[in-house]
Design a protein with these regions (language model features):
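A conserved regulatory-domain signal marking ACT and ACT-like small-molecule sensing domains
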Residues: 1-138
Length: 138
C-alpha cells in the first residue's frame, strides 16, 4: 500500500456474554478498570434478552480470568488491531490488499476521530495469513 503507513498488532478479543439491561456494560467496564485493564476496542451486539460485548484489552489473560471468576461466560479469538491514516481511501486500500490474497473479513469495528489515525479491529478468515500479507507490505 504505497504512500500509507499501516501499523498492526496481533491480539485476542474477548467475547463476554452479558444481560441486555441498563447498567451491565457499565459494571463490566468499571470492573475491568478496577483491575487495571485498559480497553482498546469495544463493540456490542444484542439478541433476545441478552447480548455480548467484544473487547480488545491490554491484558487478555488477566481480563479473561477475572471475568470467568466473576461467573460470566467468556470466549476468546485472535484478531488484528490495525491503525491506518484517517483519510479517504485508506480503508479501501487495506481491504484491497487483503482481498488480493483471498482473505475475507468476517467482521470488524472501528474507532477514531478527526485528525486521528483510524483504529480498526478486523477478523480476517485467516489471521496468520493476513499478518504475513501486512508484514510483506511494510
Amino acid at each position: 500500500m504505497a504512500g500509507s503507513k499501516i501499523v498492526f498488532f496481533f491480539f485476542f478479543q474477548l467475547k463476554v456474554y452479558i444481560d441486555n439491561r441498563q447498567g451491565t456494560l457499565c459494571a463490566l467496564t468499571r470492573f475491568l478498570a478496577k483491575h487495571g485493564i485498559n480497553i482498546y476496542g469495544l463493540t456490542l451486539a444484542d439478541t433476545e434478552g441478552h447480548g455480548y460485548a467484544r473487547l480488545v484489552v491490554d491484558d487478555t489473560e488477566k481480563a479473561r480470568q477475572l471475568v470467568e471468576d466473576s461467573g460470566e461466560l467468556v470466549a476468546a479469538r485472535d484478531v488484528l488491531l490495525i491503525r491506518i491514516a484517517n483519510e479517504p481511501g485508506e480503508l479501501a486500500r487495506l481491504l484491497e490488499l487483503l482481498a488480493a490474497h483471498n482473505l475475507n473479513i468476517e467482521y470488524g469495528y472501528s474507532a477514531g476521530g478527526p485528525g486521528d489515525d483510524k483504529g480498526l479491529v478486523l477478523v480476517p478468515s485467516d489471521v496468520e495469513a493476513a499478518l504475513d500479507v501486512l508484514k510483506q507490505d511494510r
